[in-house]
Amino acid sequence: MAELDPANPCFGCGGGNPRGMRLAFELDEANRRVIGQFRLGPEYQGATGFIHGGIIATVLDEVMSKVSRFSNVRAVTAELTVEYLRPVRVDEDLCVEGHSISRNGRVLYHEGEIRNAAGTVLARGRGRFVIIDPERYNRKNQATADTNATSSSADTRARS
C-alpha cells in the first residue's frame, strides 16, 4: 500500500488529519486499477453494526478519484452516484477497487466497487470528475490557508 502523506489533510486518504480515515491505495499499473484493502471500525457506523452510507460513499469517492492518476491529471468530483447493494458490516475485511470508464475532454468517468472477503459486491459507485489546473488549485488552496490562519489568530486574540 502507498504511504500516507503526513501533510495531506484529506479526510479520506490524508495522513495529516487525526480524525480522518487514513485510507491507503495501490495503483495496479498493469490493469489500470486502484485497489485498497481495509476494515472500518465502529466509529464509522450508522445503524448498530453497519457502516454509515456516507462513509461508504466517501470510500468510493476516494478510490475513484485516485484513478485520475493514470491520466496524469488532477481532477475533482463533480458527481457521485452510489448503489448500496448489501449492508457493510463493522470490522469486516473489505476491498475497494476503482477503474476508468471513459474520458470526454476535461471530464473523466470512473467506477468503483466495495467487496467483502467472499467477493460479494456490497456497494458500487460511478463518478464524474473534472480535470483542474493544479497551479490554479494550489493558489486557491494557499489563499484559503492564509485566510484560515488569519481567522484562527484573530479568534485566539478575541478569546484572550
Located regions from the model:
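HotDog/MaoC-like acyl-thioester-processing domains
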Residues: 1, 88-90, 101-160
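Hydrophobic core residues within well-ordered beta-strands of beta-rich domains
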Residues: 32-34, 76-78, 94, 108, ...
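Non-catalytic linker/capping segments at the edges of enzyme domains
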Residues: 1-37, 41-42, 145-160
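Short beta-strand micro-motifs enriched in acidic
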Residues: 26-28, 99-103
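Hydrophobic beta-strand-centered segment that forms part of the acyl-chain substrate-binding groove
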Residues: 63-95, 100
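A conserved, well-ordered hydrophobic junction motif at loop->secondary-structure transitions
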Residues: 35-58
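Residue-level recognition of well-ordered beta-strand positions that form the cores
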Residues: 37-39, 81-83, 97-99, 113, ...
